[in-house]
């Protein structure tokens, strides 16, 4: 049976875990790390890099390195102006107003980028587990709307995964924490990740994890803290040197990396040094950035971000009807919860309670997702997960107001119906506009979709009865139907168009991802083969130098010719069909020279044989890279 895994698809880093041996465990990637950077890069040579390899080259390739794709997934271009300004790559408007990433004249959907991260996670885990990973539970922020959830599911499909379930990150964390808890506890999960903030109140105990409320801010995360530090450093430098480093993509990328490092260090020390030599240059020569950042300064420039966490916590507690004294445990999730000011805020909001430090904030979400995968596959018994919908859902009714059909924090799956009528005499059709949000005015909420119910029999206004049904499945994805009670005619919509991709686009991306996997594998094989050839050529040259005149003339001439051919093949980026025979010939020559050297050094100790195999530039194929106008009746 194929392995089902849990995946925490994060803004900054992602984690994959599996249920095995009666417990969930994180599966390391091919580099041996338990977290994988959610970064994808496209190089000048056409190579696609994912994870740590992509992150390492970001400074030299700021326009071709895509990070924080999660902040754009399932969103339209007119929604992401702030996020687009905060990255070094180009975010443009695609078909239908969708957000797209532009790299070397090609457009990529956020779903495609996320799919590359998911594919690497699944491929690496397959190698570690010894069997193919094809099914996954993927987590999303609790405050993700329907479009973002559908887009995440699309990303999984593009990656070649069957997405068993989409679950909320705080819920997954509580599942991992509370699975073995026998006593009933009320738990607050405070989840501040790279790009999103969620808070959930849950009841945990005796195999049941029930979400009572959730709230959040899908535009707040660690990236925002980094940006404040970048602006602080850049403003200081501009004041001193008259140069705005934010206008240079390469300098900006270096600033972001330095800011992230400084933020991390300031969680454990009270001051840190930022040193970026040769950050830029002007007519007077090169410029260096050196600055000392105090924790107190960092807290001052990010204080409003910390305070933005206050509202969602208070909202969640009010919705769940709990006070400070009712909270038994506080679980911190996400790397940004290590910031001391954030931890101080949590203590302040929970009556001074210290957070539970027994869970790893970077891994707990993936572990919970793996448990849910085990539940869905029948491997985990006696565990019940009761999640909620984070935002209210309804329709636009007469006067341009939103009439809610499903209130926020309703346990899912759920099915609710309301009956509406026409607003005009002899009205032949009604337009159903499906909305998500908490505002009274329809225009202030997000439109998830719209459809029309036609052929309503002529009748005075208020007489026809139209039943509108909202059905949310366990993934939090919505189906809406409208039925004319008189004629029985029905029309409906699955809110999957709320994704920025239609079905044909998803299919195209699936096929392209599969093609690219083969191309990327071939590219990686060619690079590794050339690296191996270069290494063997170097060893032959070294051996010739060591032998000097002791090398037989005919072997020396052949070796020098082959080395010259090897250097040309590497320089010309030759394919494996040319490179591998050359490597084989050079290895034979090297073996022959080694024999001569052995004879020449027989009376002076053994010859030192250098390794000849293996690529010199890391990694194998593991990184291949990848309106209605109704009146209520």
From Swiss-Prot:
- One GO MF term, please? ATP-dependent protein folding chaperone
Swiss-Prot/TrEMBL induction comment = By stress conditions e.g. heat shock.
Provide the disulphide bond pattern: none
Described function:
Acts as a chaperone.
PANTHER family for this protein: HEAT SHOCK PROTEIN 70KDA
| SUPFAM superfamilies the UniProt entry points to | Actin-like ATPase domain, Heat shock protein 70kD (HSP70), peptide-binding domain
Instruction: Provide the protein name.
Output: Chaperone protein dnaK2
Which species? Answer: Streptomyces avermitilis (strain ATCC 31267 / DSM 46492 / JCM 5070 / NBRC 14893 / NCIMB 12804 / NRRL 8165 / MA-4680)
Alphabetized, the UniProt keywords read: ATP-binding, Chaperone, Nucleotide-binding, Phosphoprotein, Stress response
Q: Where is this region: Disordered?
A: 600-633
InterPro entries on file: ATPase_NBD, Chaperone_DnaK, Heat_shock_70_CS, HSP70_C_sf, HSP70_peptide-bd_sf, Hsp_70_fam
| Top-rank lineage group of the source organism | Bacteria
